[in-house]
């Protein structure tokens, strides 16, 4: 049996149950474990309590319980520059960004990884639900987490081979209830702490209120595709393609009580397009264009790939054909897809393996660009 005590693993600890159990398992496996709390956002909740302070207390309690050293490191500047500014620019451009994808790429597996290396780390570990498999030649494959409902490879799809080679995901083979059970059996103080939800820098706060602090809203007209005026929208950045709630129009227009959905945007005219029906024609597309396309393993500059893809988190895989050229790709769907949203990630899979992904620029319906931005 290999001597793990000579291998130093630096664990990103958030104060949640997943990262707590990650540290616990590595410690039990004999690794030299250090816990790091990342402070990425200067945050107070509606009661004036700094949530990061509360989370750090949980990290300290768990680290003391399992007997590992811990540090707190501040990445607020890196986070602002590399994640928040990106997200704000995407919202201004009428797109719907996925800050968690960028946070993993730029903070958790770049700024944090670099910092861990200064502590003499051989690996970093996080509480993500994903797996890594290592070939004899050293190539690392990123595989889906065993818990299908919790699998987080979608958010990890921009990680590079170099980043993955330095990464461990100890929870990848576990299901969430097993993780909670391990925390309870070990008496960890975070065993019953509820999971955090929402965008990493917004947390539980009201999204609309948060965004309006940083980006001035520009109300405009809400219209149907055939030109009927449906009232005013609050600002295009507050709406995403395919969204149902928050339109304030119900079934009052005409006799049809079918629900209304956001079916398009025109940034240049500041118009929000709405339509009735979950599968409204304007919501359906047959292909997309992506940029910032990246693979977790070395691939040719130009190639075609038959695989499956996800266009949003927790969506079932769909069969696609991907034509890759440099960091751009055309993705053709085997079946029409609903609400393909510019700014979101498209992520490619070959069975269990996450191959990588890109950011959606445009959706197309039979060769015609969809009016989504």
Curated annotation (Swiss-Prot):
GO biological process assignments: tRNA wobble position uridine thiolation
Reaction catalyzed: S-sulfanyl-L-cysteinyl-[protein] + uridine(34) in tRNA + AH2 + ATP = 2-thiouridine(34) in tRNA + L-cysteinyl-[protein] + A + AMP + diphosphate + H(+)
Name of the top EC class for this enzyme: transferase
Region (Interaction with tRNA): 150-152, 312-313
InterPro entries reported for this sequence: MnmA-like (IPR004506), MnmA-like_C (IPR046885), MnmA-like_central (IPR046884), MnmA-like_central_sf (IPR023382), Rossmann-like_a/b/a_fold (IPR014729)
Site, as annotated: Interaction with tRNA: 128, 344
E.C. code: 2.8.1.13
GO cellular component: cytoplasm
Disulfide bonding pattern of the chain: 103-200
Principal subcellular localization: cytoplasm
UniProt keyword Cytoplasm present: yes
Task performed by this protein: Catalyzes the 2-thiolation of uridine at the wobble position (U34) of tRNA, leading to the formation of s(2)U34.
PANTHER family given in the database record: MITOCHONDRIAL TRNA-SPECIFIC 2-THIOURIDYLASE 1, TRNA 5-METHYLAMINOMETHYL-2-THIOURIDYLATE -METHYLTRANSFERASE
Family per similarity comment: Belongs to the MnmA/TRMU family.
Protein name listed in UniProt: tRNA-specific 2-thiouridylase MnmA
Organism, as annotated: Streptococcus pneumoniae serotype 19F (strain G54)
Source taxonomy: Bacteria, Bacillati, Bacillota, Bacilli, Lactobacillales
Encoding gene per record: mnmA
